[in-house]
């Protein structure tokens, strides 16, 4: 069980059985709650271009840092999706949230789907999967458009041998830096690197193992709430064919929005278009 403790301007969820573990979150606004679950290897700060828009729409907006990232404590283990979904469940329970909306970006889509699998949808109104890893990243015989095992092995090897250098190149691919007419700045790359490089090395590696290897295809039947799927057709990290399109085919009630020319980090490069898409999804009953 997690208990809420608050430092000045810094709310945390603290586990009763492990006082050394604290999950950091930020909670603003009122109204129906939206929880924003960030991607790998960043933190809740990655939603900064979406939070003001959602607040202006009248929602209560909650971001949190996955364990080992941002201001949340690292642990030795517990980075599989059952444990990560448990952290989300505790956040919802301890904050006494009802009729929740869940937005998962990239790796964060896994927490959303596993939450629905393990805890059901009774307390969930709708969800959004943005540049999500759902349902499967890894290439297999029945998933030919996935990322090859060799590429995934290369990522894990680089994380173990030269993590900070790998993260620099990763975020260029994250935004298709140098390939888009709508580029992000070098400062944005530096900002992301500063967040990612400060994450726990253990958490970074173990979370990569989780998103690279978890097959959510059998769990798509558990997604029984209204769903928005947003994916860029030029995503170099999680290709649309292995993720967005398959998710749209496997989830019963969904709106599938393809961002033309969108990279993985379309929450930054195409923030205005994404925010318009989220607004339409939230306001159309």
State the predicted function of each range.
Residues 1-35, 56-59, 97-98, 279, ...:
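Alpha/beta-hydrolase fold catalytic core
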Residues 17-77:
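Conserved HGGG/HGGXW glycine-rich cap/lid loop of the alpha/beta-hydrolase fold
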Residues 83-100:
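Conserved acidic catalytic loop of the alpha/beta-hydrolase fold
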Residues 113, 117-118, 122-161:
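Flexible "cap/lid" loop of the alpha/beta hydrolase fold
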Residues 135-138, 142-146, 158-221:
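Conserved alpha/beta-hydrolase catalytic His-Asp/Glu region
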Residues 223, 229-231, 235:
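Short beta-strand/loop motif that positions the catalytic acidic residue
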Residues 236-242:
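Conserved alpha/beta-hydrolase "acid-adjacent" motif
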Residues 254-285:
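Catalytic active-site module of serine/aspartate enzymes centered on a nucleophile-bearing elbow/loop
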């Amino acid at each position: 069980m997690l208990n809420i403790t608050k430092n000045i301007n810094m709310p945390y969820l603290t586990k009763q059985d492990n006082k050394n573990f604290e999950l950091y979150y930020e909670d603003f606004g009122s109204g129906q709650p939206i929880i924003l679950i960030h991607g790998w290897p960043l933190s809740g700060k990655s939603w900064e271009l979406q939070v003001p828009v959602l607040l202006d729409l009248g929602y209560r907006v909650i971001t949190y840092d996955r364990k080992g990232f941002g201001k949340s404590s690292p642990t030795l283990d517990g980075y599989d999706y059952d444990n990560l979904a448990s952290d989300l469940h505790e956040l919802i329970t301890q904050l006494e949230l009802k009729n929740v909306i869940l937005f998962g970006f990239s790796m964060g889509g896994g927490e959303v789907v596993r939450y629905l699998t393990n805890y059901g949808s009774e307390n969930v109104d709708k969800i959004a999967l943005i540049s999500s890893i759902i349902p499967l990243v890894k290439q297999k015989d029945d998933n030919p458009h996935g990322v090859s095992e060799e590429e995934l092995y290369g990522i894990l090897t680089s994380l173990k041998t030269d993590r900070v250098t790998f993260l620099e190149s990763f975020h260029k691919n994250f935004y298709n830096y140098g390939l888009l007419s709508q580029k992000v700045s070098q400062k944005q790359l530096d900002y992301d690197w500063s967040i990612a490089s400060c994450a726990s090395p253990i958490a970074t590696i173990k979370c990569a193992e989780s998103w690279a290897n978890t097959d959510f295809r059998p769990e798509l039947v558990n997604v029984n709430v209204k769903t928005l799927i947003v994916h860029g057709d030029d995503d170099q990290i999680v290709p649309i064919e292995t993720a967005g399109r398959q998710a749209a085919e496997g989830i019963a009630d969904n709106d599938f929005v393809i961002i033309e020319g969108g990279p993985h980090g379309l929450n930054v490069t195409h923030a205005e278009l994404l925010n318009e898409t989220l607004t339409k999804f939230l306001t159309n009953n």
